[in-house]
Regions:
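S/T-rich, low-complexity, solvent-exposed segments of bacterial secretion/appendage proteins
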Residues: 1-475
């Protein structure tokens, strides 16, 4: 009788094992498209056999635990490479926008406006007494000044957009770290019972990878299953159940940053002073946005300021000593910039010239009708070396900016594509290890179904044997 009971117990346990395996298969299939999900499997172990004399009678199998098929080294590698991809993607997008500012085909370009001004000065040298030609000079100069203003405005708008995106990313980071802290608690509570917290760990791993795409982080898992996450080298965002938000605040203008740029701060406690960790953020989307905003865009703004300042300085120095149509001198052509910084933003034709084109000087001598020597000097400024120790013209300086942004944008796009390929390969590798194959799961389902049927037949057989034994007792 005891052996029949044992056989029935083996069958019953086998039925339960098959049901568990089938349910796990169903869970895998249902999560085929769930991002970050790791395929799960039921680990079966041989049940403790029983001894009967010299015999060791097997007691079937039992489900020891449900584990996930996961490679933690690969997950960490994906997080690291994702950080590089986030950085490269942000830089590529931002540099693409800067490139559009200097796109000669779309905007005709500042180079075109610069050429028009010097062409107008040449026309003035051919007709030094003409008011119509002077009007053309004024309009060309005004259009050029507005082109400088436009480029400066578009570059600062790119910085403003970077600020907005940084603030948005920081809020997303805070939401993620809050969830990671909650998952830490769930993982610990579940695993205190000795049961692997598979789904919670999958979700936490996914959040860590997504977090790494936005900001460079370091994380480590403790023996209790909880992860500690730091950002910016010192800011502990998650430690066990606790979480600290990152903050965004406007900073005063300093060290090349314009006033009002957003910077990232960290508070260790509610009552502590916020610590600026902006300079420590070197990776992820925020790192890429900061690098372009604070370095690349500022470099191009400074380059445009240098060009606007030198243009106005050279033209004013020549124009102020010349004589206008009525023999007057001492007129500035452009409003004199206070300094190089902000010259492109504030460049404008002087009110004197805007109100009276007759005040545009063309002559080098007083009361000399037909004198075009000053107009020739003004038109010749196009070819005068005024940068790099007198070896580069205004055109050369501008073209160097255009060439540089093109090279930078191309390099950033290449970096993004290369990094995207690396991440893509790692994701494919992860999919081959941890991903769900529908064909494979269907094969397993059929196998477990057959096992279930066989187990049910075993239970029925044991039941029939028990019935036979009971009937013998009744006879």
């Amino acid at each position: 009788m005891s052996r029949i009971w044992s056989m029935m117990d083996v069958g019953r346990r086998s039925l339960a094992n098959s049901q568990t395996a089938l349910q796990t298969t169903a869970h895998n299939v249902a999560n085929k498209s769930t991002e970050g999900y790791s395929r799960q499997r039921v680990d079966m172990v041989t049940a403790q056999p029983i001894g009967e004399g010299k015999l060791r009678i097997g007691m079937g199998a039992r489900a020891s635990q449900i584990t996930r098929t996961n490679n933690q080294y690969l997950e960490k590698q994906l997080e690291r490479e994702g950080t590089h991809l986030g950085y490269a993607t942000a830089r590529s997008e931002m540099l693409g926008r800067i490139e559009q500012v200097y796109n000669e085909q779309v905007n005709k370009g500042l180079n075109h406006s610069l050429g028009n001004l010097f062409n107008a000065f040449r026309e003035l040298s051919n007709n030094p007494e003409s008011l119509a030609t002077r009007t053309q000079v004024k309009e060309s100069a005004d259009y050029l000044a507005k082109d400088f203003n436009r480029v400066h405005h578009q570059l600062t708008e790119i910085q403003n957009d970077a600020d907005y995106r940084i603030a948005t990313k920081v809020e997303e980071i805070n939401q993620m770290t809050r969830e990671i802290a909650k998952l830490n608690e769930k993982v610990q509570v579940v695993e205190l019972t000795g049961v692997p917290s598979n789904d919670e760990r999958d979700r936490r791993d996914l959040l860590l990878k997504q977090l790494g795409e936005k900001i460079s982080i370091k994380w480590a898992e403790g023996s209790d299953g909880q992860v500690t996450v730091t950002a910016g080298g010192t800011g502990v965002l998650v430690s066990g159940y606790s979480q600290r938000d990152l903050l965004v605040a406007s900073a005063p203008g300093r060290e090349g940053k314009r006033e009002g740029n957003f910077e990232v701060f960290y508070k260790a406690t509610e009552n502590s002073t916020p610590v600026n960790i902006t300079k420590q953020i070197k990776g992820g989307e925020i790192g890429g946005l900061l690098q372009v905003r604070d370095n690349v865009v500022n470099e191009f703004i400074h380059g445009m300021d240098q060009l606007a300042y030198k243009l106005s300085e050279e033209i004013n120095q020549a124009h102020v000593v010349g004589y206008d149509r009525n023999g007057r001198t001492g007129n500035f052509f452009y409003e004199t910039p206070k300094s190089v910084e902000g010259a492109a933003e504030h460049l404008k034709v002087s009110d004197t010239v805007m109100n009276d084109v007759g005040r545009i000087a063309a002559a080098a001598q007083e009361n000399a009708p037909g004198d075009n020597r000053l107009a020739n000097v003004l038109s010749g400024l196009q070819y005068k070396g005024v940068f790099k120790g007198g070896t580069a013209t205004l055109d050369d300086h501008y073209n160097s900016l255009v060439g540089k942004v093109g090279i930078e944008a191309q390099r950033a796009n290449s970096d993004m594509q290369s990094q995207g390929d690396i991440v893509g390969q790692l994701k494919n590798l992860r999919e081959s290890i941890s991903g769900v194959s529908i064909d494979e799961e269907m094969t397993k389902m059929i196998e477990f179904q057959k096992s279930f049927d066989a187990s049910a037949r075993l239970v029925r057989t044991a039941d029939e044997m028990m019935e036979t034994v009971l009937n013998l007792k009744r006879m």
